[in-house]
């Protein structure tokens, strides 16, 4: 996702904690919450963004997950088992970056698949 320009970003009071929580339901975002919005300056060529960052989803394959794959590779069951094993979806990783003030909700929504 694109990273907000640190020179010109402005605090975004319009993006509420509830709006961010809605895109990552049933997970919750704890801790600080500093949403910013892009503005544009000479440094970022009037885009409001400077650089990019990766969002990552890591799956540790447990014995239970291996059993799900071997017995009946049902996609829904595999997703549920992955979440039980501690996998965090891409959208949740993006929401954490929004809470840190590094990118915007719109960037995360455009770059990540919806939660099922």
Predicted regions and their residues:
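Short, flexible helix-loop junctions that flank or precede catalytic/ligand sites
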Residues: 1-116
